[in-house]
Each structure stands twice: as C-alpha cells, then as structure tokens.
C-alpha cells in the first residue's frame, strides 16, 4: 500500500507569484557546533521563499536557535556579501492550471532577491549594504544592495522565531525519543507590524547511518584513547581507515607547511603503492 499526502503550500501572494516570508530546516542535533554552540542546542538553515531552495543546496543562513544573535555569515562585511542568499523560489501562479509535470519544479520561479524587494516582502528580513560607509545596516533603506540577514528576526526579535524553534525541537525530540529534523515556514503580516504565523510542515527523526557514532566518548578511559582533540568537527565511524599519518605538534611551525605537505605526500604515495 502507498499513501499520497497533499500538503498545502504556505505563503503570501504577490501578483502572479506566491511564497512564504521564510522557510527553514531545523535539527535538534548540531554535529558541527561553532564557538559557544553546543551539539544538543541544534542548528537551523533559513531562507527567503519556498523551502525547495534549501533542499536544492542554495545559500541559506545558518544559526543556532540558542544563539540567534551570533551568525557567522554576517559577522564580517566580506563574508555577508559573499555568503548570503541572492536567489529564491516562488510558486508561479500563471502556471497553476492543468499543465502538470513529473518535474516538481515545473511551476516554480527562481528569482533574484531584487524581485522580492519589488514585492515588498523583505521588511524585517533584509539589511542594506552602505557602500560609502562600508557597513551593513539592519533594515531597508533607499539605495544599496539588500542582504538577506534576517537581522530583525534573529537579533531584534521582531518575530520570536528562535524561541519557537527551541520549543518545537525540544518537544519533538522528547516525543520521538530521538533527535529530530523539522521543516517549517513563516508568513509575516504586512498589514500589522511585528506579527506573523509559524507553520510546522514536517517532523521526522534524524536517520542514523553507519557513519554516525552514538556513544558517550567521555566514558572511554584515557589509556584506551589513541588520539584526543578538544577542537574537532563532528564524529563518526569509518571502517576503511587502515593507516594514520600523524604530524607531531611539539615542534610544529606554520612556516614549514610546504615542506610538511611534501613529506606527507611522499608517505601517502608509499601507502598507495603498497596497496
């Protein structure tokens, strides 16, 4: 047997296109915490428009719901201009008739952020780049490139998105008894200031794989540890590793990086030749 689920698209209408103020994917487990973040606090990827943009690997804004004011992508001017969203997806209402296709994107428009500015949907979502003062100002101002920072949502709490996500992730994980991933959308009201609607679209458990490690590493005795690091990314199990090349840190100097790289390359080639 197979079930077919029809899910209503969430959003606001802007002429011949339809899209939410923002869409996102949130996870209750963060495998790559940054700075003060903790793995159990989760992580969020947020974008303007339909969520297909996130699924397709578009440039989203990544933040921790426990630290919404600390966003790496907007921490520096150069990073914010290079690593923030410039495109978004909207539903094409002119192509919403009987012209169906197996392509799930047949009735979607991939638009530049400038089109959202024309729609008036960037209020509370975008900031404005001032090329004269070389700063990004929270909010919309005449002239200047519009940068999708969600600053008024995350830093100024115009809409309590971070609090809602913390609550949903906590109770979702509690009820499923395992880490969860959620999909959500938000529509902001343009006729009433600082109001909107949060839509919880999907809740699903994070699927385990053989590359994920579900073990308390702090319980492993020191005498059984080969290598230990307090500054590493993620964790897991890889059964295909047979040799480890270790660069001693006692007398390590960055000035010798090129020579060290050559030495490591020779060792790697030796392993490859030996099969």
Name every feature range the model reports, one short phrase each:
Residues 1-275:
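Conserved mixed alpha/beta core segments that line enzyme active sites in large multi-domain catalysts
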